[in-house]
Swiss-Prot record:
Belongs to the RNR ribonuclease family. RNase II subfamily. Residues 193-521 form the RNB domain. The gene is rnb. The lineage of its organism: Bacteria, Pseudomonadati, Pseudomonadota, Gammaproteobacteria, Vibrionales. It comes from Vibrio cholerae serotype O1 (strain ATCC 39315 / El Tor Inaba N16961). Its EC number is 3.1.13.1. This is Exoribonuclease 2.
Amino acid sequence: MFQDNPLLAQLKQKIQETLPKKEGTIKASDKGFGFLEVDSKTSYFVPPPYMKKCMHGDKVVAFIRTENEREVAEPSELIEQSLTRFIGRVKLFKGKLNVAPDHPQLKKLSLKAKTKKGLNEADFQEGDWVVAHLVRHPLKGDDGFFVQISHKITDANDKIAPWWVTLAENDLPNSEPAGIDDWQLKDDADLVREDLTALPFVTIDGESTKDMDDALYAQQLPNGDFALTIAIADPTAYITPEDEMDKVARERGFTIYLPGRNIPMLPRDLADELCSLMENQVRPALCCSVTIRKDGVIGDDIRFFAANIKSHARLVYDHVSDWLETGSSEQWQPSEEIAQVVRDLYAFSQARANWRETHAVVFPDRPDYRFELSADNDVVAIHADMRRTANRLVEESMITANICAGKTLQTTFGFGVFNTHAGFKAEKMADVVELMAVNGAPNADAETLATVEGFAALRRWLATQETSYLDNRIRKYQSYSEIGNQPLPHFAMGLDVYATWTSPIRKYGDMINHRLLKAHILGKAPVQTPDETVGEELALHRKHHKIAERNVADWLYARTLADEPAKETRFQAEIFDINRPGMRVRLLENGAMAFIPGALILDNKERIECNGEDGTVLIDKEVVYKLGDVLEIVLTEVNQENRSLVGKPTQVFADLVSETQTSAEQPAEGAENNEPQV
């Protein structure tokens, strides 16, 4: 009877006009209530009845009123809803379609749903994975929440779910682009391709690699220098900037690499066949030749040219590594011609690695963790693959090639697609200088560290320290690597300029650089120039791909390690992050990440302190763990819903003995001599 009473509505409006308003973000609890977080120090309680009008993550304006002598927030206006397009699972209530969002704070919600036009509700079963869109919200004046299902991802128990769901969540494709029936070579009429089919190029890749995009040749000269030629697959020979396939490649940005599978940027018939530098097959290629001095310095005779080449040997990383490291390989016996090419490539790579270790930055070796899957998408094993001699040989070749491209694009055009890194964040430089001064780092003043040479020298000094603690500490002061169209330095690599062009089958930015390098060869204006937005586009693609890769891995780790808490399996783990709630570690055996709450290190808030600023864990004010430490842990929880791992150290910290206890436990004076006590 009071619901539509205009007088009551008028009175309510007048009361609300007198109430203060606050803007903030809703943080939900699993108990029905929530909080309006205004800033890092201010929050207001949101009672359960008011929480029914909003959900976790919503940005809202709320009235602040007093109820039961407590300030509470009543959300009144929606600024930005947390859910728009989202991934969820079907819930059926009395035959009616509902969707539960696949989000840790929202999983308990069950939102009424319908399918979009063209989908049949009967095709959706309990637990099916779907893409949904929130189309009604109470704070928009709607009667409750309501969602529309736009797409079914896969069935409830499909083991492919980790891949398909993660790709859908990040709005990424789950298959290669469609090819065309008849690929045509579209070279510029003035482009001359040199015939290098007689030169004994070799490819070195993984055993199952099909999209072989680089072939190498080196010859050590009588004076000890090296004549190096790098040949790179040439998809821009078939794809022009105006082609529809170019738009597809730009939209994808990169080949997507996920645990156990990849989603190509280009059609497989192009990437794995027509452009792949297969053994004994003539292929168009973009090439770079350069002399590398025996001391590892790159010569000034950098030359880019187009060619037709033929790989004379399709080699495998492990076979080549075995042969170089032990003198033989059971799986591979090279001809003398190929053996000499590999020996010279190896000698060149050592010269370059030595130069980079002395003058630039060499990243520490870390294993690549590889999931081995069954035909049913179950994890059979997780392998920790260390980079071996052949991997480093190829890496040095690619880095050399990309330095050559960077220099050429910088000189010829002053633009291109460059990988850049700005070193330390300007606002953090004072912190870096202070930290390094305390720890005795040489030449670590702000002016020096603002140069590539000074930054690289500090990184080399950090690499000589006994532990990786300072290295880990300093990382949070560094900028992120970027992609841009200006030839800026790459501080993290210790290089003045760096432009990748060695993976055009897998990276759209490399395709752009190929077109620029061809313009350089022809002495013509480029058919494509990188605009201001291309770097941001590619960086965003790369970010989403990395998130997808990590999310699939987390899902597979949760599946694979589900039984380990019950088994109390012990793992060696490295600390890579410490914050106030606890520390994050990486299991060295398989690469899984786990969180260790402070309470599972020592359940006494008075005694333990997790200091994120210093990267240390202290007990009774003594450092017990720090960034980079390796410790033994057991997993205590594997949460399949959230795809997360929780662990605790096997080390047990003793209870603090009070002075009173200590006095009581000490023998009275003379007791050890059995003297009578008076």
